[in-house]
Amino acid sequence: MSPFLRIGLSNFDCGTCQACQGEAVNPYCAVLVKEYVESENGQMYIQKKPTMYPPWDSTFDAHINKGRVMQIIVKGKNVDLISETTVELYSLAERCRKNNGRTEIWLELKPQGRMLMNARYFLEMSDTKDMSEFENEGFFALHQRRGAIKQAKVHHVKCHEFTATFFPQPTFCSVCHEFVWGLNKQGYQCRQCNAAIHKKCIDKVIAKCTGSAINSRETMFHKERFKIDMPHRFKVYNYKSPTFCEHCGTLLWGLARQGLKCDACGMNVHHRCQTKVANLCGINQKLMAEALAMIESTQQARSLRDSEHIFREGPVEIGLPCSTKNETRPPCVPTPGKREPQGISWDSPLDGSNKSAGPPEPEVSMRRTSLQLKLKIDDFILHKMLGKGSFGKVFLAEFKRTNQFFAIKALKKDVVLMDDDVECTMVEKRVLSLAWEHPFLTHMFCTFQTKENLFFVMEYLNGGDLMYHIQSCHKFDLSRATFYAAEVILGLQFLHSKGIVYRDLKLDNILLDRDGHIKIADFGMCKENMLGDAKTNTFCGTPDYIAPEILLGQKYNHSVDWWSFGVLVYEMLIGQSPFHGQDEEELFHSIRMDNPFYPRWLEREAKDLLVKLFVREPEKRLGVRGDIRQHPLFREINWEELERKEIDPPFRPKVKSPYDCSNFDKEFLSEKPRLSFADRALINSMDQNMFSNFSFINPGMETLICS
């Protein structure tokens, strides 16, 4: 296998060449590839292949051998212009490797001029030259892990589009007019009108967002419903002390005429915020929101009380008979024991009075509740750190009661809250609780929490992930890649049958057990309730794997998982990503417009599978249209036996013991396994009820954990 560079030359600039003054240059270039050889006369370069004359803005291929150089000569057809430069192909390939497989540079020519050169790195099975020297140098596109991204969650309240925001300067809430405390993303800010608020004040916003308050829908709404139409009387004002805008919450800058002040209510705003302030002069939004909430709760209580009467005044409904009345009342009263236990470990277990309320529960349920409330991080010994990120850390832990080993994923509550990922965390827990129904999904034992952290206790898969293994062998052979792809298909189809779109399929998230079977992990990006014609439009995923319909802002369904599956198979078979770019903008353009490169040595069935997976029309993509199991690449697969794990994997990872960590990145294993410190002020002010339904134990694992 020999790597090669696909090179393009363009944009020749002759500079200040005297011979070019007043003349049309009309240049052309000649490319001479020379080999380094040792001779009796010493070291020298010899040209073994014919000279190439590539047209401008076209491409040509040059294979990489150590010592091989490329001489580029530019000549003029109409003038005496000769410029040249020499490029070492090995150094150019190294530059491409550091820039995600491609590079773009200006070449300075001698004696004058310059030109733009684009180069892209590829692998090909055409030369028989030994590639060991290049393997040692790491000429591969898959040389680092890639993190997922997700569009900020948008809270739509009264036409506002609030997103969690980090305020780099002191900011005040436009609802309660108090300071927005905290680190990271302290509060919400509207993307349309820039109104800043506390996260806790989002339910107290009564003014609709329109960008302008003059004759706005919001003003008309209050005028018709509440008879409120009080425009502010703003006038330019000179502030003698630091003052904050009561709309966007930031400081009014300047020495004079810094902002506007309302003569009636004294509201202070920026000049730029004047047109975005609602006509609510003299109205306290916080108090009005509380009053409206009280009225609503009073009306609900009154309607509930009225429903208990047999006859009603006004428009008459048929009176409910006594038997119906008795049947409808109990659902209004919470049933003891039916509510999911809080599971907060710093609380003491339920006392006897709570246990005696209501009918006695089965013995298994009581054991589960007791264990769920008592389980804490001190029940585990943290041996190694397997990975970490902005979310938290993953540990290899030993359960003290049974001396069994688990992988514990610890999330920091303050980070989850700041990133507005509470619901994503709950989705991950629910998907993991379903994983026991399928052999190729990571199984979760239980979840519990402390005041600072959330913990997922999962099976420890000591075979490592596919990204770790592909970095050592650079690509998988056809039988191995086909086996992994088939097991991933079964896992994806199970998730899709449950109405779950995975949205983060990549090498990093495919783990191996000790026998060599795959397990899909990390369900934090999943979307639930996607059965039938349901679609979503959240922008999320790992950049290299994102489907074009996501980039185009279109609504999508499980079709995006089959595009990501195509990228996964391409990387397993070829050893590099199908789409490239120096930054995300170029990468996304490549995903939308470019066709992947297929080496000549790629098997016909594998290429056909990839072509059908990389169809940009979601409804025509394989997996959405047609049965992917029937593709010729999988003709040797017995799907029933595969799902029962009756087929031996082609590769078995080296595992020395149940707690072996040799298949994980060494950079994490060397760190001390300990929990990160949380923001104490934020933790103390946090509403812990947001995580009240987090704690969970899988019923199928009660005996194992309690033994």
From Swiss-Prot:
Kindly list the positions at which Phosphothreonine occurs in this protein: 219, 538
Q: In which tissues is it expressed?
A: T-lymphocytes and skeletal muscle.
The entry's comment on post-translational modification says: Autophosphorylation at Thr-219 is required for targeting to the TCR and cellular function of PRKCQ upon antigen receptor ligation. Following TCR stimulation, phosphorylated at Tyr-90 and Ser-685.
Membrane association type: Peripheral membrane protein
Subcellular location field: Cytoplasm; Cell membrane
Give a yes or no for keyword ATP-binding in this entry: yes
Which residues belong to zinc fingers classed as Phorbol-ester/DAG-type? 159-209, 231-281
Where do the segments described as Disordered lie?
A: 327-365
Give details on activation and inhibition. Novel PKCs (PRKCD, PRKCE, PRKCH and PRKCQ) are calcium-insensitive, but activated by diacylglycerol (DAG) and phosphatidylserine. Three specific sites; Thr-538 (activation loop of the kinase domain), Ser-676 (turn motif) and Ser-695 (hydrophobic region), need to be phosphorylated for its full activation.
In what residue span(s) does the C2 domain sit? 1-107
Q: Where is the AGC-kinase C-terminal domain?
A: 635-706
Q: For binding ATP, which residues are annotated in this chain's numbering? A: 386-394, 409
Q: Which residues carry this modification: Phosphoserine?
A: 348, 676, 685, 695
- Using the UniProt record, give the first listed, main subcellular location: cytoplasm
Reactions catalysed, as given in the entry: L-seryl-[protein] + ATP = O-phospho-L-seryl-[protein] + ADP + H(+); L-threonyl-[protein] + ATP = O-phospho-L-threonyl-[protein] + ADP + H(+)
Q: Which InterPro entries match?
A: AGC-kinase_C (IPR000961), C1-like_sf (IPR046349), C2_dom (IPR000008), C2_domain_sf (IPR035892), DAG/PE-bd (IPR020454), Kinase-like_dom_sf (IPR011009), nPKC_theta (IPR034668), PE/DAG-bd (IPR002219)
Please state what class of enzyme this protein is: transferase
GO biological process per UniProt: CD4-positive, alpha-beta T cell proliferation; cell chemotaxis; inflammatory response; intracellular signal transduction; membrane protein ectodomain proteolysis; negative regulation of insulin receptor signaling pathway; negative regulation of T cell apoptotic process; positive regulation of CD4-positive, alpha-beta T cell proliferation
UniProt-listed Pfam families: C1_1, PKC_C2, Pkinase, Pkinase_C
Which family does the record assign? Belongs to the protein kinase superfamily. AGC Ser/Thr protein kinase family. PKC subfamily.
What does the record give as the function of this protein?
Calcium-independent, phospholipid- and diacylglycerol (DAG)-dependent serine/threonine-protein kinase that mediates non-redundant functions in T-cell receptor (TCR) signaling, including T-cells activation, proliferation, differentiation and survival, by mediating activation of multiple transcription factors such as NF-kappa-B, JUN, NFATC1 and NFATC2. In TCR-CD3/CD28-co-stimulated T-cells, is required for the activation of NF-kappa-B and JUN, which in turn are essential for IL2 production, and participates in the calcium-dependent NFATC1 and NFATC2 transactivation.
Q: What does UniProt say about this protein's domains?
A: The C1 domain, containing the phorbol ester/DAG-type region 1 (C1A) and 2 (C1B), is the diacylglycerol sensor and the C2 domain is a non-calcium binding domain.
The name on file for this protein is Protein kinase C theta type
The organism's lineage is:
Eukaryota, Metazoa, Chordata, Craniata, Vertebrata
